[in-house]
A protein has these predicted regions:
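Soluble, non-transmembrane alpha-helical interaction regions
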Residues: 1-130
Length: 130
């Protein structure tokens, strides 16, 4: 699970880098960087993020649910502990998106920073603090 979550995090960065490279001429400030490459939803021209999301879903289904390791969330400490088997991968994906958002805000010194609370799961629900 940790390996798949790590690969999803890397996919977020790769998609961001590809977008910045492809849209370099049109990105003139932080506002256009956010709207063009970060959304939400994040621009993913090669489908890297969706591919890793599918792999994470498959990993949960094959290695945990089919193996009888349920509830999956109870096996992992943290914010996803209470997630059902069906929503566990989505919860992990939201946590990864939150960490990516916080990291990209710092790494690119984005001002004003991207709202990570809406970036992680599309909802303003205090699930990702700055």
């Amino acid at each position: 699970m940790l390996q798949r979550a790590g690969k999803l995090y890397v996919a977020h960065w790769k998609a961001f880098r590809i977008c910045k490279k492809n849209e370099f001429a049109s990105i003139t400030n932080d506002a256009t960087l956010k709207s063009v490459c970060l959304g939400p939803p994040q621009n993913d021209p090669k489908g890297l993020i969706n591919r890793e999301l599918s792999r994470l879903d498959d990993k949960v289904a094959k290695k945990c649910v089919k193996a009888g390791v349920t509830p999956v969330g109870a096996q992992f400490p943290g914010l996803c502990t209470g997630a059902s088997d069906a929503t566990f991968a989505d919860c992990v994906a939201a946590r990864v998106a939150c960490r990516f958002c916080q990291s990209v805000n710092r790494a690119d010194a984005i001002l004003p920073p991207l709202n990570c609370d809406t970036f992680d799961d599309g909802v303003s629900n205090a699930s990702c603090s700055p």
